[in-house]
Amino acid sequence: MELFKKNLELLRSSQPSLARRVEREPKKNFVHVSISKDGNPIPKIGSVLLHSKYYPSKEAKDGLSEYCLRSNETPVVYGLGFGYHVLEILNKYKGLKVLVIEPVMSIFRSFMENVDIEPFLPNTQFIISTPPPKIITSNQTVNWNKYEHQPSKRLSC
């Protein structure tokens, strides 16, 4: 729980209203966390693993091998899981801001409990459990280059 408190403080500095929402979110047990072969936490919801149970960072790198941004584009990621693919984008495109859309608050809370968010900040803006019309009206969407995290997408079907 200490990591969760540290992450809340970090989130407060960049997105205070989201930090308050996360803090109020009750802990739910439908996100199960196991450890991958290489020692990283991986979330599972029902029968869906959100990352490789062996090498989630390698899976992220391989999955993004053909993802390319033009100089005027903003990377927009649909589905957070535990963010291995987001870190890959941040590493591949240093200095760029990444917009992450995660429709399920409980997944984000579990992410906050299990993953140090410091490497994501300040270049990541999290949009959590927000209706699509609000996302579109609140953000400049013209130059979005979307990446869909496929396991997260399967959850929303």
Per-region residue spans from a language model:
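N-terminal donor/sugar-recognition subdomains of glycan-related enzymes
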Residues: 1-157
